[in-house]
Amino acid sequence: MHLPVAWSRRRPSSPRSRRISRPQAACLSGLTRKLARAIREGIRPDGSVIGPPMPIPLYRGLSDEDVMSMVIDLRQVPAVENDPGESRCDVPLPPSYSPPVESASAPDRGATVEYGAYLAGHMAHCIECHSPMGPQGPMTDTHTVASGFEFHGPWGTVISPNFSSAEDGVAEYSDEDVKAMITQGLRPDGERMSPPMPYANYARMAEEDLDAVIAYLRQLPPLPDGAGLE
């Protein structure tokens, strides 16, 4: 999937995460539906569109059950009164990210390629960060996990590595190596991986889910780093 907007190789500047905890005085009528719509369709309660880096094109495939689980968790977050200010997006945003999502389901859970694709795409959006950037956004359709996405932060500049089935990708690692990188942020040589790899968030992934993600990665076409992009 691609964002229907023009991207640069760097993220649009000044995106600010919005407060999503529940103030005591807030009206809860329709909150579940509004949160689900914001997550899966990128539409705020006031009708405005949420921009990058929120991976709406991938979240559109989240199952109804998984979206509801997220909403339930968010509604249990302690109340926080905070105004982060307005986000500023340097690219034009579409009026919407396509038609409303009426309903979506996930593949049956198991150590399968299909379920791994769901986890690596819609749930964890691994394929966004590990795919090179094109003019329409991360090239997740044609250059899936071929590396090349640049991240700029306090750590400097990090380029996401190749995780296709190429020899310089996932093929050179054992399943246990890949699991350690995903859940602990440790390379086979023991070196710590750089931010923004969110391994702390993946630390509690079930073994079966990790097996599914690895099965998915190993069947992807082998692509060179950056898939030959300049």
Predicted regions and their residues:
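The canonical Cys-X-X-Cys-His
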Residues: 1-2, 35, 70, 116-119, ...
